[in-house]
């Protein structure tokens, strides 16, 4: 079965923002969780970070440098984030991205209105920065420059690995990250813990 590009209003909204807001598309760029190969055409030199191997492979086949980890010393002029559904994970990614910006760089984030786009401006501004925004294609695009280091560190920690009160390790973005799901509870009662 041939690969069919997914329909993504998020990618269309990002491309619209670059057209109307005169964002600079040259220079070092990082795409975080890109969900549409249309972005490859606009940002052919962009580095890509995606945690899923199949997505990383698609971007690698298009000639993009795929990053395994996001290191603080990489430095990008622009970072574009296609937001995941989970709010704490999104905030952590935004904060982490701000830590990767070169001076004067910009983070541009986008989410579908049904998966958090309506509150995206508030989320970015919770890092203590002012943010521009626009709405297009039933999505919200928000952009800002770097937040303070303390705000970045706090949000990054909240989105990182955590130990819950019951002793289990968890992380925002994982299924049922903030509570014990029914299936795991059943397994705990029927399997030995060792």
Predicted regions and their residues:
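A short acidic, Gly/Pro-enriched loop at the edge of an enzyme's catalytic core
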Residues: 67-87, 194
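A short acidic, amphipathic alpha-helical/loop segment
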Residues: 38-42, 92-97, 123
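Short glycine-rich, flexible loops that bind phosphorylated cofactors or substrates
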Residues: 87-89, 116
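SAM-dependent Rossmann-like transferase core, predominantly class I methyltransferases
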Residues: 135-194
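Conserved SAM/SAH cofactor-binding pocket of Class I
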Residues: 4-62, 181-194
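Conserved beta-strand signature within the Rossmann-like core of class I S-adenosyl-L-methionine
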Residues: 104-114
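A short glycine-rich, Lys/Arg-flanked "PGG" loop and its adjoining helix->strand segment in the class I
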Residues: 90-106
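Conserved Class I S-adenosyl-L-methionine
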Residues: 119-139
């Amino acid at each position: 079965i041939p690969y069919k590009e997914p329909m993504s209003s998020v990618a269309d909204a990002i491309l619209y923002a670059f057209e109307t807001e005169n964002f600079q598309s040259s220079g070092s760029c990082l795409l975080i969780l890109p969900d549409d190969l249309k972005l490859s055409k606009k940002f052919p030199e962009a580095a890509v970070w995606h945690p899923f191997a199949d997505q990383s492979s698609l971007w690698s086949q298009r000639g993009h440098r795929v990053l395994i980890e996001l290191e603080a010393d990489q430095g990008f002029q622009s970072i574009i984030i296609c937001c995941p559904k989970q709010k704490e994970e999104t905030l952590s990614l935004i904060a982490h991205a701000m830590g990767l910006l070169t001076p004067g760089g910009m983070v541009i984030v986008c989410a579908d209105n049904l998966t958090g786009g309506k509150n995206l401006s508030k989320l970015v501004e919770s890092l203590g920065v002012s943010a521009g925004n626009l709405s297009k294609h039933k999505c919200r695009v928000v952009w800002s420059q770097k937040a303070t280091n303390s705000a970045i560190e706090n949000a990054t920690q909240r989105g990182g690995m955590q130990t819950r009160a019951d002793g289990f390790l968890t992380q925002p973005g994982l299924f049922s990250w903030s509570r014990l799901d029914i299936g795991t509870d059943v397994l705990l009662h029927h399997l030995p813990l060792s």
